[in-house]
Structure formats: structure tokens, C-alpha cells
């Protein structure tokens, strides 16, 4: 399903972030509450995590 696919994308995006377990759990829970998590929301979540000073590693970046 589309929501399951987006949920998986959320996991893959969140995993590289240097988040504590509680932060990851909170972010995943909020993402999963959003049945139709859009790519824009995922991008915003990644940007927000970056802005908060977490080390971010994205595929294709060094």
C-alpha cells in the first residue's frame, strides 16, 4: 500500500540521522500517525533534524 511504502521511506530517512532512541521513536510515531506521510513531510522532517544540529548523512553526500 502507499502508506506502507511511505512508512518505509520514513524509516530509511530517519535511520541515518544521529537521533537518540527516544527521538527516533517519537519521530516514527508521529510519522505513522500521519497515514499518508507525504514526501514533503519527510523532507521537512529531515531539514528540521538538520537544523536542530543533528549530524545528517544522506545517500550520495560526503
From Swiss-Prot:
Zn(2+) binds at residues 50, 54. GO terms for cellular component: extracellular region. The active site is at 51. It is found in: Secreted. GO terms for biological process: proteolysis. Residues 24-54 form the Peptidase M12B domain. Inhibited by EDTA, and 1,10-phenanthroline. It comes from the Eukaryota. Disulfide bonds: none annotated. The N-terminus is blocked. One of its GO terms (molecular function) is metal ion binding. It is an enzyme of class 3 (hydrolase). Glycans are attached at residue 29. Expressed by the venom gland. Its EC number is 3.4.24.-. Its cofactor is Zn(2+). Binds 1 zinc ion per subunit. Keywords: Cell adhesion impairing toxin, Glycoprotein, Hemostasis impairing toxin, Hydrolase, Metal-binding, Metalloprotease, Platelet aggregation inhibiting toxin, Protease, Secreted, Toxin, Zinc. Belongs to the venom metalloproteinase (M12B) family. P-III subfamily. P-IIIc sub-subfamily. Dimer. Negative results: has no effect on alpha-2/beta-1 (ITGA2/ITGB1) integrin. Does not have hemorrhagic activity. Snake venom Zinc metalloproteinase that inhibits ADP-induced platelet aggregation and inhibits the alpha-5/beta-1 (ITGA5/ITGB1) integrin, a fibronectin receptor. Has caseinolytic activity. Induces the detachment of cells that are bound to fibronectin. This is Zinc metalloproteinase-disintegrin-like BaG. It comes from Bothrops alternatus. The lineage of its organism: Eukaryota, Metazoa, Chordata, Craniata, Vertebrata.
Amino acid at each position: 500500500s502507499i502508506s506502507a511504502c511511505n512508512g518505509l521511506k520514513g524509516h530509511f530517512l530517519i535511520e541515518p540521522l544521529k537521533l537518540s532512541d527516544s527521538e527516533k521513536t517519537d519521530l516514527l510515531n508521529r510519522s505513522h500517525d500521519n497515514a499518508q506521510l507525504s514526501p514533503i513531510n519527510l523532507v521537512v522532517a529531515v531539514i528540521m533534524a538538520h537544523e536542530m544540529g543533528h549530524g545528517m548523512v544522506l545517500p550520495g553526500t560526503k
